[in-house]
Amino acid sequence: MTHAEQNKALWDSRADLGMSAGTNDVRAKRLEMRAISAKIEDGMRVLDIGCGNGITAVDLALTKRVDVIGIDHSEKMIAAAKTLAEKSLGCLTSAEFCVGSIDALPKGLGLFDVIYTERMLVNLPDWEEQASAIYSIGKMLRSGGKYLMVECSMDGLSALNDCRESVGLSRITPPEHTTYIDDASVDNLYVPGLRLERTIDFTSSYYFLSRVVNAWQAKQLGQEPSYDAPVNGLADTLPAIGSVGQVRMWVWQAR
């Protein structure tokens, strides 16, 4: 199977996992959802590329007065997203879902105030395809619109692993199906009509607590670390400190 076929098979198999469909770490997922929601205002037209089973898009439709479209290459994920929208939104039509991908976009989508990806680019096989995706996204933004690129950072993971090694923990390796974002490549990328506004390390406190402190405590007890450990919950109230979060938000603005 090709990389794309293997990737699709993986996400097809996870379509019915609810909040855990995109990641087993539900707390990390909620952090991502809050970070995205904070950048979206009422009245906006929003596109979620790689929407999975629609958790983030439906949440936006429930909590904001926005029109959101979600696309994903997994038919099973889209079916799950439509079911979730029907159960959560009833007769409301502020969220719609269709099969598609960054290299096979549905026709007639139009322009958007905000486009976001949530660990979608890392599922592409290399930086060349990731950069091409950013180019394509830039073309779908209205003037002044923003692309919220919520993706896994190689620099963030490296810094996190340095902390883990310093307390005797093994380094974390990225999942086999992913290509984490090279931060320097993003910083040096020129995209016509698009400007990199800022990078936000919004997960740093959480990953330090969960992957270093919690993991170290579990090791002392001879246990496997749990995503539900109480110490991980501190990140819900603490500000993001440092730059050891493996998920970052790159904020791009259309000129």
Residue ranges and their predicted role:
Residues E176-G193, T199:
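Short alpha-helix
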Residues Y116:
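A conserved beta-strand element that flanks and buttresses the S-adenosyl-L-methionine
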Residues M1-I40, I55, D59, L148-S170:
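Conserved class I S-adenosyl-L-methionine
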Residues L47, N53-A104:
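Class I SAM-dependent methyltransferase SAM/SAH-binding core
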Residues L194-A229:
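Conserved catalytic loop of SAM-dependent methyltransferase domains
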Residues L124-S136:
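A short, conserved alpha-helix within the catalytic core of class I
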Residues L141-Y147:
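Short glycine-dipeptide loop
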